[in-house]
Amino acid sequence: MRLLSGASASRIPCPLLSLARARARCLPVPASATACRAASSSAAAAAGDGGALKPWLFVGLGNPGKVYQGTRHNVGFEMIDVIAEAEGISLSSMQFKAMVGKGRIGDAPIMLAKPQTFMNASGESVGQLVSYFKIPLNQVLVMYDDLDLPFAKLRLLPKGGHGGHNGVRSIINHLKQNRDFPRLRIGIGRPPGKMDPANFVLRPFNRKEQEELDFAFHRGLEAVRIMALEGFNKSATYVNTAQSSEMLNR
C-alpha cells in the first residue's frame, strides 16, 4: 500500500471506540492474571541488583490525522486507544516520532506507542523506541490491520514476516531484518468485488462492523493484559480459546 501523506498528526477521539471504551473501563483483569501478580513482584525483586524489569512495548500502527480516523487501516491505533482508556494511561508524550504513554498492568510496566510517521514509515519510530529503551524484541507487540483475516478476527503470532503489510515491513527493516517480535493481527476482511485494497483500507466501518470490532477490541485488551502478566503463550491460548468458543456459540 502506498504511503499516505498530508494529514495532521493530532489525536482526535474516535466515535467508533465509545462502546469498546465503556466496556473496557468495567472489564476486570483476568483472574489468572491477578494470581500472577505475586510472581511478577517476585521477578521484580529478583531484578533488584541494580537492574529493572523492561517494559512491554505495545505498538499500534496507523496513519495520523482526522481524515484517517475510524478507517480500517487504523485499527492498530484504535486498539492502543482502548488499552490506554482501560488502564488509565495518557499518550501525552511525543518521543521518537510517536505518541507515547507509560503505565502498568498490575505490576508489569508497559509502554504504549502510536507512530506518527504514517504507516509505511512506522519502523523509523519503532526502531528508535526499541533501541533507546533497550526493550527485548520478544516484549514488543505490534498491532495492525490484516486483509487476509476475516473481519474482527484476531491472530496472535510470536514472530514472522511482513505478509505484504508495509508498516510491518518498515519495522523489520529498521530492526536490521530481525523478525522475532510478536504481532497481533486484526482482521479487516477482503475488499468487495474488484475494489483496490489501497482504497478499501481507507474506508470507514458501518454500524454492524463497528459492533463486531468492539468485541475484537475487548478480546485484544484481555490478550494484552494476560501477555503483560503471564507471557505470550498464555495470551495466545486465550485468543485461540475465546475465538473458538465464539464460533461454537453462533
Swiss-Prot record:
Tell me the residues of the organelle transit peptide.
1-45
Q: Can you tell which superkingdom this protein's organism belongs to?
A: Eukaryota
Residues binding tRNA, per UniProt: 68, 118, 120, 166
Which terms are listed as keywords in the entry?
A: Hydrolase, Mitochondrion, RNA-binding, Transit peptide, tRNA-binding
Q: Which Pfam families match?
A: Pept_tRNA_hydro
Q: For this UniProt entry, what is the primary localization, expressed as one broad class?
A: mitochondrion
The enzyme's E.C. designation: 3.1.1.29
What terms describe the molecular function in GO for this protein? peptidyl-tRNA hydrolase activity; tRNA binding
Q: Which family does it belong to?
A: Belongs to the PTH family.
- What this protein is called in its record is Peptidyl-tRNA hydrolase, mitochondrial
Q: Which species is listed as the source? A: Oryza sativa subsp. japonica (Rice)
Query: Taxonomy-wise, where does this protein's organism fall, top ranks first?
Result: Eukaryota, Viridiplantae, Streptophyta, Embryophyta, Tracheophyta
